[in-house]
């Protein structure tokens, strides 16, 4: 199945980051929080401005991002894999390596 996001929506695959306590112990299960990092799988056509123009999104497919997982973030299954659908405004940063 293929999902194509609309407007300023972005589809992200969460990337798991190893969680460690302050003392260096690796946390697992319920002690570890879900990562707020991911990889952009698809982007919409852009944000529609008040004057009707479409502004292209700053993120692109393949970008590694840090996002805010809050209200408005939708979780879906895509080919058996969990993906997130969110607005570009929920993306806090692009990670450059």
UniProtKB/Swiss-Prot annotation:
PROSITE patterns: CHAPERONINS_CPN10 (PS00681). Its main location: cytoplasm. Transmembrane segments: none annotated. It comes from the Bacteria. GO terms for molecular function: ATP binding; metal ion binding; protein folding chaperone; protein-folding chaperone binding; unfolded protein binding. GO terms for biological process: chaperone cofactor-dependent protein refolding. Gene3D superfamilies: GroES chaperonin. Coiled coil: none annotated. CDD domains: cpn10. GO terms for cellular component: cytoplasm. It is found in: Cytoplasm. It holds the Pfam family Cpn10. SMART domains: Cpn10. Keywords: Chaperone, Cytoplasm. Together with the chaperonin GroEL, plays an essential role in assisting protein folding. The GroEL-GroES system forms a nano-cage that allows encapsulation of the non-native substrate proteins and provides a physical environment optimized to promote and accelerate protein folding. GroES binds to the apical surface of the GroEL ring, thereby capping the opening of the GroEL channel. Heptamer of 7 subunits arranged in a ring. Interacts with the chaperonin GroEL. Belongs to the GroES chaperonin family. This is Co-chaperonin GroES. It comes from Tolumonas auensis (strain DSM 9187 / NBRC 110442 / TA 4). The gene is groES.
